[in-house]
Amino acid sequence: MPDLPGSSPERDAWMFQQSIHNSLLQFDDVKIYPTAICQSSDSNLIITSTIAEWYKEGSYKPYSEVDLSLLMNVLKEYKTNIQPWVRIQRLVRDIPSKSIEAGYQKYSNLRQMLHDEMKKEGKVCQCIRCMEIDDLGDNNISPTLVVRSYPASYGTEYFISYEWYPTFSWLFSLYLYFFYWSGDNSRKAIIGFCRLRIDKNPGGGFINELKNCGLIRELHVYGSSLQIGKNGSSSQHKGYGQKLMIVAEDIMKSYGLKKSAVIAGVGTREYYKNKCGYYLEGTYMVKELKQSYMYIWVILIFVILLI
């Protein structure tokens, strides 16, 4: 929430940098709400706002009211450098401009203004919302498997995704398949992703079904859904979800983990059961992991060829 009383463009820029680089602040989603001073909707003034009182007294004035570009520059810097595993859910509260007394000069379409400026400057936001693909349809494209890992809250997170790039060679594809290259931020569109967490004490160490487990926290494939039993070309029905799950399970095996656990809602349990081989244990969908030593042979063959 930038532009709060006592803050400044420099402090807000530091705050956003912390959210990018601090391992304790690696959230999945974020809502950015620049400070807005709103009129009270209560005629008896039972609902009061200290910030509104400070504004009327003259002891506080949002810096965006003095110069909107100060706030815009802070937001552009964050959107340009945001980690690709974060999704900006909202930017600016959905408040009618007539209800705003002060703050970002009452522009309720600030997000659109921000994107227009970034487009003119040749800047691109790397967040999931700005990169997610609507639907592949029948387009004949070959998405790239990208695996990113990062420390988060005393554990390791993996952001596994299928992304579309303009060029892609078969040799590079082979390298990706066996070694899970980490990729870069030059992607064009994200088709789907899986969030995997590796933790020394999954579930805090007191949930029996999570012992020695890797945790799949989220699986999401973009595109339109179809009725059960119907065929179609939607990206949700091209098997990307299953492929992402296989990669996540391979990573768990490399840590020597025995089980995979999915935080799955009631409506998605059948998918994990029928498509991925999971079963219900407690409140989690779990799967026993069978160790495969094929990757050792691949590495040995690769070394022999190099020699």
Residue positions per predicted region:
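Non-catalytic substrate-recognition and accessory regions of acyl/acetyltransferase enzymes
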Residues: 86-214, 220-222, 226-228, 255, ...
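Conserved C-terminal portion of the radical SAM core fold
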Residues: 1-53, 69-97, 215-216
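Conserved active-site alpha-helix within GNAT-family acetyltransferase domains
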Residues: 264-284
